[in-house]
Amino acid sequence: MMAPFKIFATVTGTTCSQKGAWLVLLCFFQFSFGQSQTVVSHEPPEIIEVFDAMYRYNLPEAEVKLKALYSTGINQNWIDLAHVNLLWWWLISGDKSRDYDNLMTVVLKRVINRVRNIPPDQLTADEVFTMIHCYAYLTRVDIYLERYFVGIANLRHTLDYLEIALNRTNEYDKFMMVSGLYNYFAAATVNKYPVFIPFFALAPKSDRSLGFNLLTRCSEMDNILIKNESLYYLMKINYQLEESFDSALKFADQLITLYPNNLIYHFHKFMILIEAGRKPLAMAQYTKLMEVSFKAPGLNPIQRNHLVDIAKKKLLKEKINPAI
């Protein structure tokens, strides 16, 4: 969904302070994809169905729906971006059966090579978004695997495309999403981690408050890709950066109401409660996480236990007995 220091060694919220900056810097590039003048994007319903299965955490179903896309006339870039998102969900689910790093890199570079020789100012709005998305995902994989310097190089490739999106924020819903993520996380990174000031010296200016407001607007849109990713990042912003735990819980509950079987959302609700010091509620959410994990369709034993095990370690670290 979407966004310097410990990126989730999984998708956890457990970070190591030295690497925390990487997570903030990365977050504004992690998204799947206003007002009356804003052009609303409309992905084909078959693409939406793939994402819907991912959000429901039914990854085998998403895989079947993705494979069916190749026999349609749908734009190949849309198919490839859906493919990359699905590979990412498999990776963070804890699955070890495929080389997701290599698979994602191959697909992303294939998309980039289709577009990279066209001058940025001659691209369609969707092609600009596609290039931002692809370079961002390359960075996402690099940081996840702790290849930080390679990740920074990929981030730099986004700047020409990013500037177009920022200058046209209100023209296109995906640009509004990009602008919200960039403005918030770039400003937050510089404020919390001054070591990154040189990186942003040549980057567009950022406004933390503007970013938050744009993400809030995006969270109210009808496009489920923009709505869900905005809700997800507002949840993470509120508990990881703003320490506004009640607001974070509100967004977590919205996501869980929409997708009650999504283990990622349940895990983050657990982390919010832990970080807020609400240990009895965190323990109850841990139990709920185990229940949902047990019932989730099509997962192997490693995937079923992946987030539960991380949550269990967090409980033990907080001196809470998971068996109680």
Stretches found by the model and what they are:
Residues 35-80, 86-102, 106, 117-120, ...:
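Extreme N-terminal leader/anchor segments
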Residues 74, 122-123, 169-171, 223, ...:
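Short coil turns that delineate tetratricopeptide repeat
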Residues 203, 209-213, 280-295:
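TPR/TPR-like (Sel1-like) alpha-helical repeat modules
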